[in-house]
Amino acid sequence: MDVTAKYELIGLMAYPIRHSLSPEMQNKALEKAGLPFTYMAFEVDNDSFPGAIEGLKALKMRGTGISMPNKQLACEYVDELTPAAKLVGAINTIVNDDGYLRGYNTDGTGHIRAIKESGFDIKGKTMVLLGAGGASTAIGAQGAIEGLKEIKLFNRRDEFFDKALAFAQRVNENTDCVVTVTDLADQQAFAEALASADILTNGTKVGMKPLENESLVNDISLLHPGLLVTECVYNPHMTKLLQQAQQAGCKTIDGYGMLLWQGAEQFTLWTGKDFPLEYVKQVMGFGA
């Protein structure tokens, strides 16, 4: 790819950043489509995020992806949020139109799309959702919008717990889905929730390097063959949770599905063009 002065810059702002496959995926897609953009990763944490957004404007970047730990903070730095992003309270995509910043969240649509592409119908189903960060709440919000009957959200009593309660209130007030929030330390409640669940989704970083030997499911007997287990983590590809799920006879969806479909939507938001899906799946080695 020969980058010229006509090329526009798209970024990814996250910390840590070196594990991300998004730059490789998006640049392969941009090159295949013959579009004058290049995608670069920038190591940005909460402290440096405000300055990074000023830099985005000053450099007239087309936009940026947003990942941990900036997804919720980023909402404060855009001029407009989509209705779904407001419900989530977090964004993973910024589009810059001549200095006017719009915030989107493609994590939820991407993950739910991956579930649907597997042939699973979420309407009327119950999901156990692990975590209350940006990706997790995006999945919950989109699932509620698209027909989940109930979401049982489990999170530790950390800085995200109050945010989880606020998220549940927003979803309960604006959709027909019922959301409850429980401390993950309550293992009896967790076991009871899994027993009646149709879907278990890990929206946390547990399982991602360097936590690849960890899982929030401490007892594999809690997983039953009728359960669909889905991951947001894609590095490593086969997390400990997915290994447990396969041993228990569950159907699984790895983190590549969400990465692919959320990235496809981002690509279109930034470029106005269709994402070369089949090509990217092939060159990236995704089985999604």
Curated annotation (Swiss-Prot):
Keywords in alphabetical order: Amino-acid biosynthesis, Aromatic amino acid biosynthesis, NAD, NADP, Oxidoreductase
Catalytic reaction equation(s): L-quinate + NAD(+) = 3-dehydroquinate + NADH + H(+); L-quinate + NADP(+) = 3-dehydroquinate + NADPH + H(+); shikimate + NADP(+) = 3-dehydroshikimate + NADPH + H(+); shikimate + NAD(+) = 3-dehydroshikimate + NADH + H(+)
Domain of life of the source: Bacteria
GO annotation terms (biological process): amino acid biosynthetic process; aromatic amino acid family biosynthetic process; chorismate biosynthetic process; shikimate metabolic process
Keyword Lipid metabolism carried by entry: no
Pathway annotation: Metabolic intermediate biosynthesis; chorismate biosynthesis; chorismate from D-erythrose 4-phosphate and phosphoenolpyruvate: step 4/7
Binding site for NAD(+): 132-135, 155-158, 205, 232-235, 255
Protein residues bound to substrate: 71, 107
Gene Ontology molecular function: any one: shikimate 3-dehydrogenase (NAD+) activity
InterPro entries recorded: Aminoacid_DH-like_N_sf, NAD(P)-bd_dom_sf, Quinate/Shikimate_DH, SDH_C, Shikimate_DH-bd_N, Shikimate_DH_fam
Annotated Pfam families: SDH_C, Shikimate_dh_N
EC number: 1.1.1.282
Iron as UniProt keyword: no
Annotated Gene3D superfamilies: Leucine Dehydrogenase, chain A, domain 1, NAD(P)-binding Rossmann-like Domain
CDD domains: NAD_bind_Shikimate_DH (cd01065)
Top EC class of this enzyme: oxidoreductase
Family classification: Belongs to the shikimate dehydrogenase family.
PANTHER family, A to Z: BIFUNCTIONAL 3-DEHYDROQUINATE DEHYDRATASE_SHIKIMATE DEHYDROGENASE, CHLOROPLASTIC, SHIKIMATE DEHYDROGENASE
Function: The actual biological function of YdiB remains unclear, nor is it known whether 3-dehydroshikimate or quinate represents the natural substrate. Catalyzes the reversible NAD-dependent reduction of both 3-dehydroshikimate (DHSA) and 3-dehydroquinate to yield shikimate (SA) and quinate, respectively. It can use both NAD or NADP for catalysis, however it has higher catalytic efficiency with NAD.
Complexes and interactors: Homodimer.
Protein name: Quinate/shikimate dehydrogenase
Source species of the chain: Escherichia coli (strain 55989 / EAEC)
